[in-house]
């Protein structure tokens, strides 16, 4: 994930294409509503449409958000239905069963694949051109399901993947060294879940490996402390859910960061989930650094991993593939 990349900017100048930017959010739960709020504050979209089976809740969210618009950006937010997917720049899918304390993301699969089939059936009635951005867990499996069930081009079906894990990882390493997290380049790849892995071999600060940075800055290189950063990253969602019941702020910021890269045609490298293959395992969706622009997500680099990282990525991809096969979508 590129260091120094931000969703928000003080630059209030908008392109002439701003009025055509419509983002549809399916799901008015914690993640969906927080994504709508974050998107409103970003000023990226002229229209934000909220769709939910609970229309009263979705309408209430839209009303509340519209009251924030005069204090932020000129954006129209409204309760919509699937017809509003027509001419949408992107459809963000956050709807689904939430992860409860003690549950893994994979535990949600059976319930959420059923929900997704209904949602995608409706979405594809009204758009064949939007970018589909999946946030519902297990996100890698549901990104693959979205691709298969819609027949959309692979570059236009994107999962939020490990963008939030990468952000968490950078935050924790930055905290360890007393640095702005955006000064840290360190990626989490593979599954957004228990088998994800840290790419230690390419982690860097100011162009230096972590070990070299510590030597140059006369800071102790503590491998155990760094491993704790990864452990905390991997367990972050469980820890937050145990305390407050759900995660939403970081995920929403990640989704809007992805949308920003698409809307601004940035060609930004972000760790998101997309169709890929690895080590002859076959087609599967998992996170790697991908280039994001107005056309979607594109894999432009091959990972040069250490032997240990390669083995871990193989196992991570296999675990996603197994889950895909369990719902008959291979």
Curated annotation (Swiss-Prot):
<dbReference type="GO" id="GO:0005829">
    <property type="term" value="C:cytosol"/>
</dbReference>
<keyword id="KW-0560">Oxidoreductase</keyword>
<keyword id="KW-0520">NAD</keyword>
<dbReference type="GO" id="GO:1990748">
    <property type="term" value="P:cellular detoxification"/>
</dbReference>
<dbReference type="Pfam" id="PF00056">
    <property type="entry name" value="Ldh_1_N"/>
</dbReference>
<comment type="similarity">
    <text>Belongs to the LDH/MDH superfamily. LDH family.</text>
</comment>
<dbReference type="InterPro" id="IPR036291">
    <property type="entry name" value="NAD(P)-bd_dom_sf"/>
</dbReference>
<dbReference type="InterPro" id="IPR018177">
    <property type="entry name" value="L-lactate_DH_AS"/>
</dbReference>
<dbReference type="InterPro" id="IPR001557">
    <property type="entry name" value="L-lactate/malate_DH"/>
</dbReference>
<feature type="active site" description="Proton acceptor">
    <location>
        <position position="192"/>
    </location>
</feature>
<dbReference type="InterPro" id="IPR022383">
    <property type="entry name" value="Lactate/malate_DH_C"/>
</dbReference>
<dbReference type="InterPro" id="IPR011304">
    <property type="entry name" value="L-lactate_DH"/>
</dbReference>
<dbReference type="GO" id="GO:0006089">
    <property type="term" value="P:lactate metabolic process"/>
</dbReference>
<feature type="binding site">
    <location>
        <position position="137"/>
    </location>
    <ligand>
        <name>substrate</name>
    </ligand>
</feature>
<dbReference type="GO" id="GO:0005634">
    <property type="term" value="C:nucleus"/>
</dbReference>
<feature type="binding site">
    <location>
        <position position="168"/>
    </location>
    <ligand>
        <name>substrate</name>
    </ligand>
</feature>
<keyword id="KW-0963">Cytoplasm</keyword>
<dbReference type="GO" id="GO:0004459">
    <property type="term" value="F:L-lactate dehydrogenase activity"/>
</dbReference>
<comment type="subunit">
    <text>Homotetramer.</text>
</comment>
<dbReference type="InterPro" id="IPR015955">
    <property type="entry name" value="Lactate_DH/Glyco_Ohase_4_C"/>
</dbReference>
<comment type="pathway">
    <text>Fermentation; pyruvate fermentation to lactate; (S)-lactate from pyruvate: step 1/1.</text>
</comment>
<dbReference type="Pfam" id="PF02866">
    <property type="entry name" value="Ldh_1_C"/>
</dbReference>
<feature type="binding site">
    <location>
        <position position="105"/>
    </location>
    <ligand>
        <name>substrate</name>
    </ligand>
</feature>
<protein>
    <recommendedName>
        <fullName>Probable L-lactate dehydrogenase</fullName>
        <ecNumber>1.1.1.27</ecNumber>
    </recommendedName>
</protein>
<feature type="binding site">
    <location>
        <position position="137"/>
    </location>
    <ligand>
        <name>NAD(+)</name>
    </ligand>
</feature>
<dbReference type="InterPro" id="IPR001236">
    <property type="entry name" value="Lactate/malate_DH_N"/>
</dbReference>
<dbReference type="GO" id="GO:0006113">
    <property type="term" value="P:fermentation"/>
</dbReference>
<dbReference type="GO" id="GO:0006090">
    <property type="term" value="P:pyruvate metabolic process"/>
</dbReference>
């Amino acid at each position: 994930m590129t260091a120094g990349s931000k969703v928000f900017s003080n630059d209030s100048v908008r392109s002439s294409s701003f009025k055509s930017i419509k983002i549809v959010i399916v799901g008015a739960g914690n993640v969906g509503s927080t994504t709508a709020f974050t998107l409103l504050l970003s000023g990226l979209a002229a229209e934000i449409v909220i769709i939910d089976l609970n229309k009263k809740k979705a309408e209430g969210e839209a009303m509340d958000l519209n009251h924030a618009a005069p204090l932020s950006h000129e954006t129209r937010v409204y309760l919509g239905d699937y017809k509003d997917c027509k001419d949408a720049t992107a459809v963000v899918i956050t709807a689904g069963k939430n992860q409860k304390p003690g549950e893994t993301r994979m535990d949600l699969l059976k319930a959420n694949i059923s929900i997704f089939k209904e949602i995608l059936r409706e979405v594809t009635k009204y758009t064949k051109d939007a970018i589909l951005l999946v946030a519902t867990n297990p996100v890698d499996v549901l990104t693959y399901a979205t691709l298969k069930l819609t027949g959309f081009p692979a570059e236009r079906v994107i999962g939020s993947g490990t963008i939030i894990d990468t952000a968490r990882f950078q935050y924790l390493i930055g905290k360890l060294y007393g640095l702005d997290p955006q000064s840290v380049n360190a990626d989490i790849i593979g599954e957004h879940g228990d088998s994800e892995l840290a790419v230690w071999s390419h982690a860097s600060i100011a162009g230096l490996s972590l070990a070299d940075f510590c030597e140059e800055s006369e800071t102790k290189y503590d491998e155990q402390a760094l491993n704790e950063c990864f452990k905390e990253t991997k367990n972050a969602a469980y820890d937050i859910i145990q305390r407050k019941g759900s995660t939403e702020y970081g995920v929403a910021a990640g989704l809007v960061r992805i949308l920003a890269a698409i809307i601004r045609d940035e060609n930004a490298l972000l760790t998101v989930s997309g169709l890929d293959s690895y080590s002859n395992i076959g087609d599967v969706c998992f996170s790697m650094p991908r280039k994001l622009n107005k056309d979607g997500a594109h894999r432009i680099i091959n990972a040069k991993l250490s032997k240990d990282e390669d083995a871990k990525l193989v196992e991570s991809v296999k675990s996603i593939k197994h889950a895909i096969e369990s719902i008959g979508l291979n």
